[in-house]
Curated annotation (Swiss-Prot):
Cellular compartment(s): Cytoplasm, Cytosol
Bias type Acidic residues, positions: 192-210
Motif (KEN box): 353-355
Name under which the protein is recorded: Cell division cycle-associated protein 3
GO CC annotation terms, alphabetical: cytosol
Keywords, comma-separated and alphabetical: Cell cycle, Cell division, Cytoplasm, Mitosis, Phosphoprotein, Ubl conjugation, Ubl conjugation pathway
Positions with biased composition (Basic and acidic residues): 137-152
Pathway assignment: Protein modification; protein ubiquitination
InterPro entries from the UniProt entry: CDCA3 (IPR038832)
Primary subcellular site in the record, as a coarse category: cytoplasm
Domain remarks in the Swiss-Prot or TrEMBL record: The KEN box is required for the association with the APC/C-Cdh1 complex.
Function summary: F-box-like protein which is required for entry into mitosis. Acts by participating in E3 ligase complexes that mediate the ubiquitination and degradation of WEE1 kinase at G2/M phase.
Biased composition (Low complexity): 296-308
Length: 363
């Protein structure tokens, strides 16, 4: 491990042939001989879109690119594809040239002959179209319209820009149509007026007068007896019904008072009478179930806990249990719970008596 100063600088054995490499300090650099790209400075003009387009449009035909590392050095590069707008402009120019050439050729085509030659050709065409077949006689009136038709056709064929001229036949047809339309329309209008005015008036007058009178008479005749009969029926029906209702209303409060008195008497005696057809929920009273209170019974044939303790602690428990088992099938009713209980003061008095007797005997 030594410093950089101790190492001797190695020089290449062969001299460098490239004159660009001799300027570079380090010949081992892979980019030796390629000029460095300039660094952009703040004051330098930046590339705007216009300058970029100009650079794209300017495509050199034979670009001079020299790169010693390139495998295709000395081979000319393929030209870049031109932009779209340039291609469209070229297409438009080519199409315009083609269409202009076609227009010029079509305009000069049909009008090949000019002057007296064109007039002679027109006459020959007219004669060939209007010439009648052999052995037939043709009137002068029939020839004239055919000649006019042929002339108009030739004019249209020779000069396509000329407007169509109305033929006399078309004019005649138009005049006939005008003449036909006017009298027919007038006659139809007059017929309609004649039909509408007298018929409508007569029909309305005839329909309105007798029918309206008959209807009014019928209504007057129908209204009078029907109204009278209805009024009589109402008067007859109202009188008995009103009497019946009054009597019922008088009877109802008496019955209600009697029922109230009877219910009060039943409540006083304590007898609860249930109304038929009415549930307690419909009357608004809750149906509360009253469970019967069960009598508290001891676990073993009515013996109290104190009695159980006394019997268990006594010496002759077995005999008592046996006697209880034997006597259990007898028909005597079991004593109630309260009767079996031995009260505390009675028990103490019995013990005092025994102690007193024991003391007397000892003395």
């Amino acid at each position: 491990m030594g410093s950089a100063e101790s190492k001797a600088q190695v020089t290449p054995s062969r001299p460098l042939r490239n004159h660009l490499l001799s300027r570079v300090n380090d010949p081992r650099s892979p980019t030796s001989g390629i000029p460095r790209t300039p660094i952009e400075v703040g004051e330098s003009p930046r590339n705007t879109p216009q300058t970029v387009k100009e650079e794209e449009e300017e495509i050199p035909d034979s670009p001079e690119i020299f790169d010693p590392r390139s495998p295709t050095n000395g081979i000319t590069r393929t030209p870049l594809r031109p932009p779209i707008h340039a291609v469209l402009n070229n297409l438009a120019k080519q199409l315009s040239e083609v269409f202009v050439a076609e227009d010029s050729s079509t305009e000069g085509g049909p009008l090949g002959f000019t002057g007296p030659e064109a007039t002679n050709l027109e006459r020959q065409v007219v004669e060939s179209q209007t010439a009648p077949p052999a052995g037939e006689h043709v009137n002068d009136h029939e020839v004239e319209p055919s000649v006019e038709k042929a002339e108009t056709q030739i004019d249209l064929e020779v000069c396509p820009g000329v407007e169509k001229v109305k033929s006399p036949i078309a004019e005649m047809l138009e005049t006939l149509n005008d003449q036909e339309e006017s009298p027919i329309a007038e006659t139809l209008e007059t017929m309609n007026d004649q039909e509408e005015s007298p018929i409508a008036e007569t029909m309305n007058d005839q329909e309105e007068s007798p029918i309206a009178e008959t209807l009014e008479n019928l209504n007057d005749q129908a209204e009078s007896p029907i109204a009278e009969t209805l009024e009589n029926l109402n008067d007859q029906a109202e009188s008995p019904i009103a009497e019946m209702l009054d009597t019922l209303n008088d009877q109802e409060p008496v019955a209600v008072a009697q029922s109230v008195v009877s219910t009060e008497s039943t409540q006083a005696t304590g007898q609860q009478q249930k109304t038929r057809g009415k549930s307690p929920r419909s009357s608004g009273v809750k149906n509360v179930r009253q469970r019967p209170r069960k009598a508290l019974l001891s676990s073993s044939s009515g013996r109290s806990p104190l009695r159980i303790l006394q019997e268990d602690n006594s010496p002759n428990t077995n005999t008592q249990h046996r006697q209880a088992k034997k006597l259990s099938f007898q028909s005597e009713p079991a004593l109630p719970h309260r009767a079996l209980k031995i009260s505390h003061p009675n028990w103490e008095s019995s013990l005092n008596k025994e102690n007193a007797e024991y003391g007397h005997s000892n003395s």
